[in-house]
Structure formats: C-alpha cells, structure tokens
Amino acid sequence: WTEAQCNQLWLDILRIAEDPTTRAHFIGSVVYVSTGDTSAGFTRWLLIDGQQRVTTIMLILIALRNHIEETGWRGTEDGPTAKRVEAYFLKNLEEEGDRCPKLVLRRHDQATLRALLDRQDYPADISARIRENYEFFRERVAQVDPETIYRGIGRLVVVDVTLDRLTDDPQLIFESLNSTGMDLSQSDLIRNFVLMRLPERE
C-alpha cells in the first residue's frame, strides 16, 4: 500500500478503538483457496484477493510486538503482550522454516517480511515498500497506547470468501474483484496468472 492508504487504515484503527459506539469496521474482502497442502498439520491457503491489506495489518502487528518488547510495556490482563501478538497473528510457534510464518509473500517481499518477523537485519535485496510501511507504523505505534491499537485491530472486519479449487476459477475471480478497485499493473495480472497455474511449492 501507499503511505496515504497506510495512514487511512491507521486513522480508522484509532477511530474505532476510541469510539464506544463502533463495534466493527469493514475493510474489504479476503478471498482464498486451499492449496491442498496439509503436510504441516494445518491447511495452507492461497490468498487470491486481499494480500495488501493482510500484509499491512501484519506490519502493524509486528510494529506493535516490537514496541512492547523494546519498552517493556505492560497493560491489562487481556491486553496485548509480545508473546500473545506473535502467537495469535504472526507465527506458528511450533513450526520452523517456511512453516513458521503465518503469512508468506512472494519471494522478494518475503525475505524482508521474514527479517522483520525474526528480528533480523534486512536482506541485501530489500523490499523498499515493506520496509517503508513497517517504519511508518513503527513510528506511530510508539505514540499510542498499545491497548488502543490492539482493540482497534480487533474490531476490523473482512468478508471472508473461500473458493473451491475444483469448481471456481481463481484467476477469473481475481480479475473481477479488482476490475473496479485500485488499478493493477500488467505485471500484477501476469504474475497472478502464472502463479495460479504453478504447483503451490513452486
């Protein structure tokens, strides 16, 4: 997402967290299809639509976890802790390697996201957008009570759509969903077309 989109989501999170009359805030749809891979002991899902909003929320949660760790902040019993945020949203803590992150991006972006998840230095081939958006949220998280952020994120709502790989055409649905939204580049469309036809491991 652009900085303007990140800022709007951030403002929405703060607004719904502080408004006692608002119990939920709709942020769009998330469409996914099962990859058929259950080797990790759980089902892996391929995101067809909603990748950018899911990634952006993940970056907010990483920033929140890191802020809590670095400051030693403590809130209420039901409030966020670094361990709780990591276990609920960021990692499969009983898994290792590629099975550990709860979100896996395309290769270039994934290396940068994984570095943030694992508290490591950025890779040489850094994803500038992932880094910039993380740093945008890291700066803002430090200025707000973590309880407020956690409450706001908990009130975000999406429409959850599961496709059947045997009967639904993920590529057609992807193009339909994005035909009236933010313009996609030709590279986005081509990449998605290719990825829809690759085995999940590739």
Please annotate each region the language model reported.
Residues W1-E202:
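Glycine- and hydrophobic-rich flexible loops that cap the catalytic core of alpha/beta enzyme folds
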